[in-house]
Amino acid sequence: MIYDTILETIGNTPVVKINSIGKDLNCNIFAKCEFFNPGGSVKDRIGWKMVEDAEKAGKIKPGDTLIEPTSGNTGQGLALAAAVKGYKCIITMPEKMSQEKQIVLEALGARIVRTPTEALSSDPESHISVAKKLQKEIKNSHILDQYSNPSNPDAHYQNTAEEILKDFGENLDMVVISVGTGGTITGVAKRLKEAIPNIKVVGADPVGSILGGGDEISSYLVEGIG
């Protein structure tokens, strides 16, 4: 199959049965392999969707600068879309995130600004605050803001969930989704609940994260969620 751009290869990721882990369980376990997306993660979907929707709304145009605070995966999806569509891209990212992510982002043409991992989101040195500061300083720059942009859950409501329904129909009892911005779990859960009202939706959250509502709030090593 021939595509006009790499962006058209985003989505329609394969689903693979997990045989070893679930062999002693009275159920079938499947994994949707989002690492098959060209940028390497599920966040390619929202990077492309946020850019497309902002263009259609007349909010951005090629040549502008896109700035995004991210743990890296959304940054890779956004940098990929920016490279194809002709935007400059600046990614603000905590120092905790892997050097490999920075290498990929730079290969896609993005400029990387590292920030202290321990900085709270409200701190002037945080990746969110630094992104806002850069947006004020750079002409024709925009923060598409994965944290509050409706295009984030919409990408999963319109595409990811539909792919799951195409593969499983109503023969699905539970879906487990990691939680970062909440866009994936929100969009997928909304659509699946419409089609399969009794489906159970489980959010995977690291120990120490505030999102799951646990008693123990502490630092953790896992990147991109929590």
Residue locations for each model-derived region?
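PLP-dependent amino-acid enzyme catalytic core
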Residues: 1-226
